[in-house]
Amino acid sequence: ILEKIASDPEDNEVKGVEIRLWEKIKTKAREGRRTGVGITAEGDMLAALGLRYGSDEAVDFSVDIHKQLAVAAYGSSVVLAKERGAFKIFDVEREKNNPFIARLKEASPEMYQEMVKYGRRNIACLTIAPTGTTSLMTQTTSGIEPVFLPVYKRRRKVNPNDKNVHVDFTDEMGDAYEEFIVFHHKFAIWME
């Protein structure tokens, strides 16, 4: 990125702002080694297990899953710190009153003691990122939420001059679309 900015035609004064920004990003990334293990399709998992979204049983099950995921992710980061060293700005004292770290300590006292001794390789190990496109590709729910709609209508832009094209909708700009019905993959399996 810095090489690309250097080759840009703008004057150095203009480029300096962007260069300083990217240098700060690079420094912070190296100091913390942020990473993120996350989930997708949890809503489908709950449905497949017959657990109603929002029920006490489903909430308890999800809490347990996320607790196991957190302990495994942070435990792996501790193992890496033992082998390669902790992230640069790791300081166990700064985290001693952190509620999340307290929950990790309660869930796995052994892992916590190793973390105190060796640190972690990564400042953060979990993420719940937006997975809308990924869930469309994998035909699953995007997270813990249930399916928004088990059946919905999609539009695909088409060239009306193509052979054998079917135009169902034309927008105010004159763009043509074919419409088709989509069934959520797991819902379609359930219907069979």
Ranges and model annotations:
Residues I1-E192:
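Long, C-terminal-biased catalytic regions of enzyme "large/alpha" subunits
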